[in-house]
UniProtKB/Swiss-Prot annotation:
InterPro entries: Herpes_UL31. The lineage of its organism: Viruses, Duplodnaviria, Heunggongvirae, Peploviricota, Herviviricetes. Plays an essential role in virion nuclear egress, the first step of virion release from infected cell. Within the host nucleus, NEC1 interacts with the newly formed capsid through the vertexes and directs it to the inner nuclear membrane by associating with NEC2. Induces the budding of the capsid at the inner nuclear membrane as well as its envelopment into the perinuclear space. Phosphorylated at serine residues in the N-terminus. This phosphorylation regulates the localization within the inner nuclear membrane. It holds the Pfam family Herpes_UL31. One of its GO terms (biological process) is viral budding from nuclear membrane. A zinc finger (CCCH-type) spans 70-184. It comes from Saimiriine herpesvirus 2 (strain 11) (SaHV-2). GO terms for molecular function: zinc ion binding. Keywords: Host membrane, Host nucleus, Membrane, Metal-binding, Phosphoprotein, Zinc, Zinc-finger. It is found in: Host nucleus inner membrane. Belongs to the herpesviridae NEC1 protein family. Its main location: host cell. This is Nuclear egress protein 1. The gene is NEC1.
Amino acid sequence: MSSRSVKSRKSTKSRRHHPYVKLTDKMFFSAISSKKELGTDFLREMDAPICTSKTILLPLDLNSISPGRCIYLSPFGHSSNMEFQCEKCTESKNKGSGDVSQNHDLYSVTLVFYKNVDKVVKHKAFYLSLLSHSMENLKKSFTQPELLYAYVVVKEAGHNVFPIFFEKDDCLSICLTFKCQTLHIGESCLRMLMDNLPNYKISIDYIKDVYAMTFTQCFAIQRNISIAEDTICESVSTLDCTDELREEIVKGINALQIKDI
């Protein structure tokens, strides 16, 4: 037997048993989004067109959406789209509205919490929805700054949302309800939430004629944040809860009881 054939078999055998690492979509897109030159090289080598739009189903775990994509929900179907091919994403960037990536304060959960936690009038709906359960829930929210962060980021993205709170596994969860027939969540908003809230499961569903984005804590992150809790609680207790706002809270709670979140 020739040495060449033996060498060939050894080479084939070594290739057959080479340990390959399974590359997930999330790992791949995270790599090319952080290293632009890698993404450019990959695009040059592609011999098949990019799928710019994908059909998605509700309920949807937002962690399943790859970086670079937005989501569009409507009565006629739901899709995940590449940002550069989405008219609404392009429009937001051109107008400078709804693109939260331009607001550098939003990159920090702690900074957003510090700057907004005492603005009880500005975030009246957030605090009165908490207070509708109990003062204890209001105080508990101070230990979960991610709740206020999620609310502020989605509002900054240009959405009119109403917050509903519920308890799960001794932690507070927040459900942001959107009263609209069609809903577009931009890529920058999705990335901001997913990158800065790794300890929360974020999902979206259609519940009782409203779209609902739910944030549920998976594990706690220790944050050393010192605030004037008593002063904030006193300010919240003096807020006027209108009949309209009270009705919003009741409707939201009833909707969540129908859907097992």
